[in-house]
Structure formats: C-alpha cells, structure tokens
C-alpha cells in the first residue's frame, strides 16, 4: 500500500492506495510538476505507417521516457519530465514534422476505478476542471487513472477544484 498525503493539509491522515478498490470510487488526486510538452505535426497530410514508431525511436535513442501521449490524424502530443537531451530530441523530431514545445506544465492524475461500466465519474472530473484550461488528457490505457495536463500556474486551482468536487462529501461525514 501507498499513503498519499494532502499537501494543502499536511496534518491530515491522507489516503491509502492498495489493490482493494471499491467499484466506481475515486481515491486520490496527485500532481507532477516540471513537465515539458512536445507537439509534432506530420509534414504529410495524415500520419504515415510507422510515424509513431519513428517518434518513439527518437525518445528511446536519447533514453527519455514519455509520461503521456495523445495522437490525432496529423499530430502527436507527448509529455516528458527529463529535458537533459531535449535539444537533440527536437533536432531529430524537426526532420519528420513541425515541432512546438510548452514548458512549465503539470500532470494532474485522478486515481480511482474508472472501469468502462462506471458511469458519471469522468464527467464529474471534467466538470470540476471546467475552470482550468486543460492542455491534454490521457484516459483509457488504465482503468485506474485519468491524467490531465495543465499549466503549472493552474495547478493549485485544478487541485482545489478536484478536491472540492470529488472529496467534499468525505469531509461532511
């Protein structure tokens, strides 16, 4: 088990995360700072076969892990926390597409049971974040978390909004 503590309430007991999860429950919200987002737009109209592989090979070559990734027909957005080899990575990415970079981002992760038959939880999270510009969303790879990318300057607002929307009922007990 892992105990997550509340940075806004350091004396609070926090939340224990273990393998016993109540169906449809939301357990915790966590944040990871110092994230850099890279967007690659294909030079072709649609992503060619093997395009994603080429992108991932570049990151692998420079031993840089990817935290989040989203794709469309013509673009890939991904986030990293290690920028030590960013200049070299960008040079190679520019050979296969148009590249833009956003710095000072935060991944906000909502942990819970988001099984496909759970209804309403994702909309509660999105409604809570309606006051914050969301740059990217990763959902579906795991039934246990949804990750959102926001600017670091919006982190506090996002965490407070999620806490109020998702856990306010716990404080009333």
Language-model region placement:
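C-terminal catalytic "cap/lid" subdomain
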Residues: 1-141, 145-173
């Amino acid at each position: 088990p892992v105990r997550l503590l509340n940075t806004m309430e350091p004396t609070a007991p926090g939340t224990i995360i273990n393998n016993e999860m109540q169906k449809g429950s939301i357990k915790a919200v966590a944040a990871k700072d110092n994230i850099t987002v890279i967007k690659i737009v294909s030079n072709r109209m649609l992503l060619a076969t093997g395009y994603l592989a080429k992108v991932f090979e570049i990151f692998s070559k420079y031993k840089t892990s990817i935290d989040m990734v989203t794709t469309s027909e013509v673009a890939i957005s991904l986030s990293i926390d290690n920028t030590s080899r960013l200049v070299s990575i960008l040079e190679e990415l520019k050979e296969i597409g148009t590249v833009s970079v956003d710095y000072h981002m935060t991944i906000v992760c909502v942990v819970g049971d988001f099984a496909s038959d759970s209804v309403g939880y994702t909309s509660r999270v999105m409604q809570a974040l309606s006051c914050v510009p969301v740059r990217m969303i990763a959902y579906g790879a795991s039934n246990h978390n949804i990750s959102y990318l926001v600017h670091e300057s919006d982190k506090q607002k996002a965490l407070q909004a999620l806490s109020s929307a998702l856990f306010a009922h716990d404080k009333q007990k």
